[in-house]
Each structure stands twice: as structure tokens, then as C-alpha cells.
């Protein structure tokens, strides 16, 4: 089973690692066979599984249910679970809700925010809960951002994001996840923290790992598709098409053919 120590080793060795969202045991098993390194039980299940307009209605109970299902189906990947909207507003909430999803099978929890999360990160880490902090475009704050848009478009905004990353890493964050930021910034942050694995989604191909929502990479997105998405399913055929799509994603992340230039945001900072 892959651990946080393995992710740190991968970064030190320059080996890129793969991450996909997953919500059920059957997909989890296919990801195990494809040797996907990391699985995120994301609150994206609100949209991808529950058919909602955002992640905001998702509950801790939802996250624990799907975490347990994924863990039963996959004994290979590191399992990371989102704490959903407003479930870590207080330190006590963060501890109790982290306990719930960790007992369901998570090895790490993910929370969204910046420097203001430092105390939460510190308390969780001291209590044995590895924390991934999600920065950049954070879907739980979609109404604050006014929609799903590229973040850190200016040098000033990029420096603020770097300051947020620094604060949470110093507080003990084990992993960073950057969403929807310029490729140059993704590279800067990955290089700035040599002992902290950085996962990207729409953050260029210089981050240490890459994550996609599984429905997106299988072509099950109806309507507008984000720039950073590649449909790996359309390249496959036959009864093993889904498994082959997972294998193709894993290989493309490792050889850095994904994300390609067309999947990234090129902004001069």
C-alpha cells in the first residue's frame, strides 16, 4: 500500500505520481489493477455522483460512506478524503470529522484554504492526521470567487498564494494540491518545497502529481469541459477500455505527456 513516505520518495526521485477521484469499490478495484498511486474521495461526488450544482451540500457522512467503499475495493493506492464544506470551521469539528473519515479508511484528509488554516493543520497533524491543503481554485469557495476561474493571474496574487503555501507547510501540511493556476506558478511552488509533494489539476506538468475527476477523464462530463481535462477513454476500445484508460492516464502522468500545453494555463507572472 502506498504511503505518504512513498509520495515523498517519488518526489525526491523525480517520479511523477497519478491521482484520480473515486467513489465506489468497482472503480477502485480497476484503479488498483492500473496501479494508480493515489485516490481522492472528493466532495466532487456532490456533482459527479449526486447530480448537484456544487460541492456545498455534501456531508461528512457522504464522505465516510464513499471512503469505506473505495478502501474495500483498493488496497494499493494512498486514500485521501475531502472534509466537505463547513466541516472544519472549528478545531473540534476538524478533529471529529477527520476521525470519522480516517476510521472509514482514509490515510489523509484534504481541506481547502490558505494561511488561515495553519492552526487547523497544526492541530490535525499533532493528532496523527496527515493533511493535504487545497489552494488556488477551491470549489467550496466558488461563490466567493464568482465561478470556476483561473486563480493567481498576477505576480502579486501568485506571491500571495506562495505565502499561503508556506504558512500551511510550516504548520505541518503533508501535501499541497493546486487547482487552476498558471503552469509557471505550479512549477515555482513544486520547486519551493522539496519535501512536500505537490499535486496539480490545471497547474501545469511540473507538479509532482496530477489529479483528475474520474468522470472527466472517462468522457462522462456533459456540457462544458475544463481546459485541463483530457479524455483518456476515447483512445481505448473493447471490454477493458476503462482499465486501459486508467493505465494510459498513469503512464501519461509518469512520462509527463499529460498535462500537455493545451491542458495548462500559460500566464506570464
Swiss-Prot record:
State the EC number(s). 2.1.2.11
The answer to whether keyword Transferase applies is yes
Query: Quick one: which residues bind Mg(2+)?
Result: 43, 82, 112
Catalytic residues (UniProt):
179
Q: Which CDD domains match?
A: KPHMT-like
Record InterPro entries:
Pantoate_hydroxy_MeTrfase, Pyrv/PenolPyrv_kinase-like_dom, Pyrv_kinase-like_dom_sf
> What does the UniProt function comment say about this protein?
Catalyzes the reversible reaction in which hydroxymethyl group from 5,10-methylenetetrahydrofolate is transferred onto alpha-ketoisovalerate to form ketopantoate.
Protein family per UniProt: Belongs to the PanB family.
UniProt-recorded name of the protein: 3-methyl-2-oxobutanoate hydroxymethyltransferase
Amino acid at each position: 500500500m502506498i504511503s505518504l513516505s512513498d509520495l515523498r520518495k517519488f518526489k525526491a526521485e523525480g517520479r511523477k505520481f497519478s491521482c484520480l477521484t473515486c467513489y465506489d469499490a468497482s472503480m477502485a478495484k480497476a484503479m488498483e489493477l492500473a496501479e494508480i498511486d493515489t485516490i481522492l474521495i472528493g466532495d466532487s461526488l456532490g456533482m459527479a455522483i449526486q447530480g448537484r450544482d456544487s460541492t456545498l451540500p455534501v456531508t461528512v457522512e457522504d464522505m465516510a460512506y464513499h471512503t469505506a467503499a473505495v478502501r474495500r475495493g483498493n488496497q494499493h493506492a494512498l486514500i485521501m478524503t475531502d472534509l466537505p464544506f463547513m466541516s472544519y470551521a472549528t478545531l473540534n469539528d476538524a478533529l471529529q470529522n477527520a476521525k470519522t473519515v480516517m476510521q472509514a479508511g482514509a490515510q489523509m484528509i484534504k481541506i481547502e484554504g490558505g494561511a488561515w488554516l495553519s492552526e487547523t493543520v497544526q492541530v490535525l497533524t499533532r493528532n496523527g492526521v496527515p493533511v493535504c491543503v487545497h489552494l488556488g481554485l477551491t470549489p467550496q469557495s466558488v461563490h466567493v470567487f464568482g465561478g470556476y476561474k483561473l486563480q493567481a493571474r498576477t505576480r502579486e496574487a501568485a506571491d500571495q498564494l506562495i505565502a499561503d503555501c508556506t504558512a500551511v507547510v510550516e504548520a505541518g501540511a503533508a501535501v499541497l494540491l493546486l487547482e487552476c493556476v498558471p503552469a509557471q506558478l505550479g512549477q515555482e511552488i513544486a520547486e519551493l518545497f522539496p519535501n512536500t509533494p505537490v499535486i496539480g489539476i490545471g497547474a501545469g506538468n511540473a507538479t509532482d502529481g496530477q489529479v483528475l475527476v474520474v468522470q472527466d477523464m472517462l468522457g462522462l462530463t456533459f456540457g462544458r469541459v475544463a481546459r485541463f481535462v483530457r479524455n483518456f477513454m476515447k483512445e481505448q476500445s473493447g471490454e477493458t477500455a476503462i482499465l486501459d484508460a486508467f493505465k494510459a492516464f498513469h503512464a501519461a502522468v509518469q512520462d509527463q505527456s499529460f498535462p500537455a500545453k493545451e491542458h495548462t494555463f500559460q500566464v506570464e507572472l
